[in-house]
């Protein structure tokens, strides 16, 4: 049976540091480092992944590449007094994953668009790059698309800031089910309130 074009792309991206893709990624990162933190792109870098997540090559659909610095939260040192245990600076991490941060930054720049989803496209020693798929809820092409028009409803405003995307749900622990997830739903904060 003949393999699809997308299956070849997917196989290449399983190990992007090997084969022909490695050279291409090396050249891409050289260009990406010179660009801004948020850049609109004409077409997805990973077409198979973008299509899986709902991308369509039509008006009203925008793809944005976002770079996010890797590492811990870079907290500034407290100026006021604290006991040693509460003086933590160096090993304080972020509560959100980098992919969710990238989605939020893209959404803040393109305030009239709504974030559908995002995916990883590369990283080096200091930063990670993600591509976010954004939709225009006011565009007729989106409103008339049976697969995408759900996002036009007002209940999906600012969905990325409420942890409604895949990356947001992952950070909230909602991709897990069964034993051990009792405190995750409806949210960790709500669970703490109910127990107090």
UniProtKB/Swiss-Prot annotation:
Annotated segments matching region Disordered: 162-196
Example of a GO MF term = RNA binding
GO CC entries:
cytosolic large ribosomal subunit
Q: Where is the composition biased (Basic residues)?
A: 162-172
Record keywords: Ribonucleoprotein, Ribosomal protein
Q: Which domain of life is it from?
A: Archaea
One of this protein's GO BP terms?
cytoplasmic translation
SUPFAM superfamilies in alphabetical order: Ribosomal proteins S24e, L23 and L15e
Q: InterPro entries of this UniProt entry?
A: Rbsml_eL15_core_dom_sf, Ribosomal_eL15, Ribosomal_eL15_arc, Ribosomal_eL15_CS, Ribosomal_uL23/eL15/eS24_sf
Kindly list the cysteine pairs connected by disulfide bridges. Answer: none
The protein's matches in NCBIfam families, at most eight in alphabetical order, are given as: PRK04243.1
So what family is this one in? Belongs to the eukaryotic ribosomal protein eL15 family.
Q: What's this protein's name?
A: Large ribosomal subunit protein eL15
Gene name of the record = rpl15e
